[in-house]
Amino acid sequence: MSETLIKICGLTDEDGVDAAVEAGVDMIGFVFFEPSPRDLDPARAAELLDGVPHAEEGGPLRVGLFVDADDATLEAVFAGVRLDVLQFHGEESPERVEWARLEYGLPVIKALPIASAADLERAALYAEVADYLLFDARPPAGADRPGGHAQTFDWSLLAGFSAPVPWLLAGGLTPENVAEAIKVSGATAVDVSSGVETVRGIKDPERVSAFVKAVREG
């Protein structure tokens, strides 16, 4: 089996970015969604990425996370930040995902909330228009954002699940539980945000390193 892909999402400072790059993660994610404690403006994201090797130079892929963003929001980010991958984490329709993929010429990750086996049925709607699917825990009722709540879901729902495109496991992953999550779900790619923080919205370099070690060493 190939090495598990690792994405660290919601980076907000230089120490977190440096830790992720030094640990050799495959993707680093930046959130462009105001209600999130990890929200960045494009100028700050560009600042954090200054000096980070591009993917073609051996660096990680740069992912921009959006939640039901309008065209103006997307344009503002792309005007200031060079991204490699788009991530849509809201209620974007398959048509919207396909439009963005063609408009920007970039691969797209579409996040889907999971609470039961029935939720996996939506995967088929997006598999033809997204390059990756991301399965996250369904947020609590009344939440103002779709992810980053440190909640897990029943990983066994994904055991044996076959999708036409690669998928990432997210939702409450930590250095302490990620090895078990991979074992139970069969995931070949994982995404973490709050699970490598000790202060909300700020990545802890030691936990980033521990998470990557737990994934790589199982």
Curated annotation (Swiss-Prot):
GO terms for biological process: L-tryptophan biosynthetic process. Coiled coil: none annotated. Pathway: Amino-acid biosynthesis; L-tryptophan biosynthesis; L-tryptophan from chorismate: step 3/5. Pfam families: PRAI. It comes from the Bacteria. Its EC number is 5.3.1.24. Keywords: Amino-acid biosynthesis, Aromatic amino acid biosynthesis, Isomerase, Tryptophan biosynthesis. It catalyses: N-(5-phospho-beta-D-ribosyl)anthranilate = 1-(2-carboxyphenylamino)-1-deoxy-D-ribulose 5-phosphate. The keyword Amino-acid biosynthesis applies. GO terms for molecular function: phosphoribosylanthranilate isomerase activity. Belongs to the TrpF family. PANTHER family: N-(5'-PHOSPHORIBOSYL)ANTHRANILATE ISOMERASE (PTHR42894:SF1). This is N-(5'-phosphoribosyl)anthranilate isomerase. It comes from Rhodospirillum rubrum (strain ATCC 11170 / ATH 1.1.1 / DSM 467 / LMG 4362 / NCIMB 8255 / S1). The lineage of its organism: Bacteria, Pseudomonadati, Pseudomonadota, Alphaproteobacteria, Rhodospirillales.
